[in-house]
């Protein structure tokens, strides 16, 4: 299935950098904190 979900795996450096950029925006919009 193209575009389907994959098994969770540790984030590589590129993925972690993206997550670090969007996390503050997500927290601000949802008024929640994520670890």
UniProtKB/Swiss-Prot annotation:
**Region feature (Disordered):** 1-35
List localization entries: Cytoplasm
What would be an example GO MF term here? Answer: cysteine-type endopeptidase inhibitor activity
Coiled-coil zones: none
Claim: GTP-binding is one of the keywords in the record: no
GO cellular component terms? cytoplasm
Signal peptide residue numbers:
none
Q: Where is the composition biased (Basic and acidic residues)?
A: 24-35
Positions marked as site (Reactive site): 3
Q: Per UniProt, which keywords does this protein have?
A: Cytoplasm, Protease inhibitor, Thiol protease inhibitor
Name the family the entry cites.
Answer: Belongs to the cystatin family.
What does the UniProt function comment say about this protein? Potent inhibitor of cathepsins L and S, and papain.
The name this protein carries in UniProt is Leukocyte cysteine proteinase inhibitor 2
Taxonomic lineage is: Eukaryota, Metazoa, Chordata, Craniata, Vertebrata
